[in-house]
Amino acid sequence: MIFDEDSNSVTQDSGYMTVGNAYSNAVGYISMSDHWSKLTKPSSIKVESNGASPNKADLIVEPLESGFALTLGNALRRVMMSSLRGFAVYGVEIENVLHEFTSISGVREDVTDILLNISMMRVKLSGLSNKVLSLRVKGPCEVRSGMIPDTDDCIILNKDLLICTLDQDVDFNIKMYVNSGKGYVPAVKRKSVSKLSDVPVNFIATNALYSPIKKASFKVESSRIGQFTDYDRLVLSVETDGSILPDEAVALAARILQDQFQPFINFDETDEPHKKIDTKDALPYDSNLLRKVDELELSVRSYNCLKNDNITYIGDLVQKTESDMLRTPNFGRKSLNEINELLASMNLHLGMKIANWPPESIESLSKQYSEE
């Protein structure tokens, strides 16, 4: 390998490779948008129910560039667990109780146990940021969260939660203060604030867990586009408390990340030099539609099925429905999945309607696209 100071170049002495001033001409112009637009993006996000509850679901995202499933999965999970806002009970008033280190006559649990139970109560407010819930019960009975009546602006999500047990014929009167927030706020932190606020003398702060996410995990699997298997599939498993749906939680986490990343983008995309509009841009069809199906990395069985059905161009293929394809002789579910994945990688799908197809002189148009 020889370094030439005059030409500012490095030449491999075997003659197979030259790196120098001519390198940029060989590579060509790279636009700013190429850095993100050339990457493979997920064609769809599939939501699969995980059990009978609508609060549990798996979100399957594919295809992703290699390594992106781990990057995105970890970021989305951490944001969901830490930063989504929800509702929680942050304090209570219990009749004839001045502090948490006491017991109530006729009540099996002491006040600390009652506060612990109440901290697990899940609430959803609509159109409000805070509310006071009141409950009056006469024993003997079990006091459960479902005894608090639902209203138009407040719903108790876990109605079977045990608050306390009344063993005798006693009255149990309690007020619960609900507000919105994020993360976990311990009672100790709330007490320091309540001293400065106008709160009742018998107000008792509780630990408040605002996060609407009960569980969130992810796993990374392999995905494929045609014959290429070096892509990622991200499977996000999310369980919420019922105040939001799992796919809504993921969408909110993605929006938070988008907002946090925005300050790092220190350029204006409108400043990018305008590219010369070539003939390819002026033509009315997506270039992929004018490609022939024999250019795709299809299995022999799938290709022969398309050929026997007189499907020559991708534009012919995408206008077929899944039912049409499955009626093709020797064409099975495996071939259908293969074609769906390939079309998805080009942002196409079966069952599309394309006006004025096929175009006149389709052969020359296809050749023009392939040359460019």
Swiss-Prot record:
List GO molecular-function terms, semicolon-separated.
Answer: DNA binding; DNA-directed RNA polymerase activity; protein dimerization activity
Gene Ontology cellular component list: cytoplasm; DNA-directed RNA polymerase complex
Reaction equation(s) it catalyzes: RNA(n) + a ribonucleoside 5'-triphosphate = RNA(n+1) + diphosphate
Tagged with keyword Transferase: yes
Specify where the region named Alpha N-terminal domain (alpha-NTD) lies, as residue ranges.
1-268
Membership in a protein family: Belongs to the RNA polymerase alpha chain family.
Q: How does it assemble?
A: Homodimer. The RNAP catalytic core consists of 2 alpha, 1 beta, 1 beta' and 1 omega subunit. When a sigma factor is associated with the core the holoenzyme is formed, which can initiate transcription.
The protein depicted here goes by the name DNA-directed RNA polymerase subunit alpha
Q: Which gene encodes it?
A: rpoA
